[in-house]
């Protein structure tokens, strides 16, 4: 008998009862087993739930009446999100969850997203929301995971021809994914190596990827755009990577200057905290990301900059900022419990950081390299190589150093 996928269907049943009931029927007609999880807080549920809201609250460590008295809508949503997350993780661990579908407005979508972010990459995840549109930020919905977001076109209030068409497609999408999905990424993936990259380090990373593949490793490339680096580190923490070549650290530069690709304070800490072998290259530390040239803040207009595309400008860090960044990189690497090697090119960190290039500023690069070298623990090897970050010979050296590092006996610091 073919496997019948189980789909967690998340919604606030006090406001979305009819819509959840409709999608539950569609999922059942499509041959799946829907499990309705009530993420509602205040009103009375409009349909039945497999996991009622009181149980959801308790699985998150709270009583429903406490959440209802939280004092603000935001605080209540945060507390209920803990329960929704706990329920879905439990179902996944019990082998009773093959996909997740959430219907909701802004808060309802965030409640579903909280659960989806806790599940491994490869588990089908779909949010249907009117908030998935316009200029709204999608980061809170997608996070660092593989969440699909579908605009509902109409608000999720009542059943009408447009709503039914969208809901039918959503049910078919998650049912199809759950039936045909590949394996979820959970557990150590043998010799998978996480590598960070941007367009300005692509030539080198392509060469490193080829070298590691020839040696029997499986490179996994992450776009270091404010999400890619944390996504790589999240997978490292989950045991899905066996090592890291962090070749592109521009997210740290963005965090220092509040650029568009900024990340949180855990960047460059996670892999080391889990003892994974790391080879670090400061690719793209010379710039931070801003929007279209005409939108640059006044304080940046006199700086060196690179016109990347009509909606992206790369702005050069000044020497004092580069020195600060070098110290940040050193401090975070010094926390590592696993083996680390640092290789740094002395003749430029990006395609535009070359003699005659728009971002060429050797004094600034020197300030970074000096601060990095001075700040690293004495037992972390630091190689300063007289070349550019995209030099083929440098890329080959980085690949060699990684292969040598993972061949060494495992040790933690």
Label each PLM-derived region with a short phrase.
Residues 2-44, 99, 109-118, 122-127:
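N-terminal phosphate-binding or glycine-rich loops at protein starts, especially the Walker A/P-loop
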Residues 8, 15-34, 259-413:
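C-terminal non-catalytic interaction/assembly regions of soluble proteins
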Residues 16-26, 35-51, 188-226, 230, ...:
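Glycine-rich phosphate/diphosphate-binding loop of Rossmann-like nucleotide-binding domains
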Residues 47-96:
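Phosphate/nucleotide-donor binding subsite
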Residues 66-70, 135-200, 324, 384-386:
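Cap/lid and interdomain-hinge subdomains that line or gate substrate/regulatory clefts
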Residues 102-121, 205-209, 354-361:
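Short Gly/Thr/Asp-enriched flexible loops that form oxyanion-binding sites at enzyme active sites
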């Amino acid at each position: 008998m073919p496997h019948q996928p189980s789909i967690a269907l998340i919604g606030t049943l006090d406001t979305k009862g009819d819509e959840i009931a409709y999608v539950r029927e569609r999922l059942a007609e499509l041959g799946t087993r829907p499990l309705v999880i009530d993420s509602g807080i205040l009103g009375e549920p409009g349909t039945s739930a497999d996991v009622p809201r009181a149980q959801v609250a308790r699985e998150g460590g709270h009583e429903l009446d406490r959440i209802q008295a939280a004092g603000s809508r935001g605080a209540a949503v945060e507390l209920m999100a803990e329960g929704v997350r706990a329920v879905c993780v439990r179902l996944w661990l019990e082998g009773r969850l093959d996909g997740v579908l959430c219907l909701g407005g802004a808060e309802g979508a965030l409640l579903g997203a909280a659960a989806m972010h806790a599940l491994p990459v490869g588990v089908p995840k779909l949010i249907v929301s009117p908030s998935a549109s316009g200029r709204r930020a999608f980061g809170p919905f997608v996070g660092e995971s593989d969440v699909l977001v579908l605009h509902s076109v109409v608000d999720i209030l009542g059943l009408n021809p447009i709503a039914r068409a969208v809901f039918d497609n959503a049910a078919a999408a998650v049912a199809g994914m759950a039936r045909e999905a590949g394996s979820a990424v959970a557990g150590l993936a043998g010799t998978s190596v996480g590598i960070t990259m941007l367009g300005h380090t692509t030539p080198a990373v392509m060469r490193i990827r080829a070298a590691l593949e020839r040696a029997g490793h499986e490179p996994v490339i992450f776009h270091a755009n404010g999400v890619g680096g944390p996504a790589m580190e999240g997978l490292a923490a989950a045991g899905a990577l066996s090592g890291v070549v962090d070749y592109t650290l521009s997210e740290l530069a963005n965090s220092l200057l509040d650029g568009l690709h900024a990340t949180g304070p855990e960047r460059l800490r996670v892999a080391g905290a889990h003892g994974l072998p790391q080879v670090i290259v400061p690719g793209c530390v010379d710039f931070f990301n801003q929007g279209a040239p005409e939108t640059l803040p006044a304080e940046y207009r006199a700086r060196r900059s690179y016109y990347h595309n009509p909606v992206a400008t790369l702005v050069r860090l000044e020497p004092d900022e580069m020195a600060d960044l070098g110290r940040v990189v050193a401090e975070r690497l010094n926390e590592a419990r696993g083996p680390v090697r640092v290789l740094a090119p002395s003749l430029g960190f990006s395609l535009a950081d070359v003699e005659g290039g728009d971002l060429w500023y050797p004094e600034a690069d020197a300030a970074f390299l000096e601060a990095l070298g001075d700040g690293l623990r004495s037992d972390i090897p630091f190689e300063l190589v007289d070349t550019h970050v995209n030099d083929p010979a440098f890329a080959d050296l980085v690949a060699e150093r990684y292969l040598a590092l993972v061949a060494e006996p495992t040790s933690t610091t």
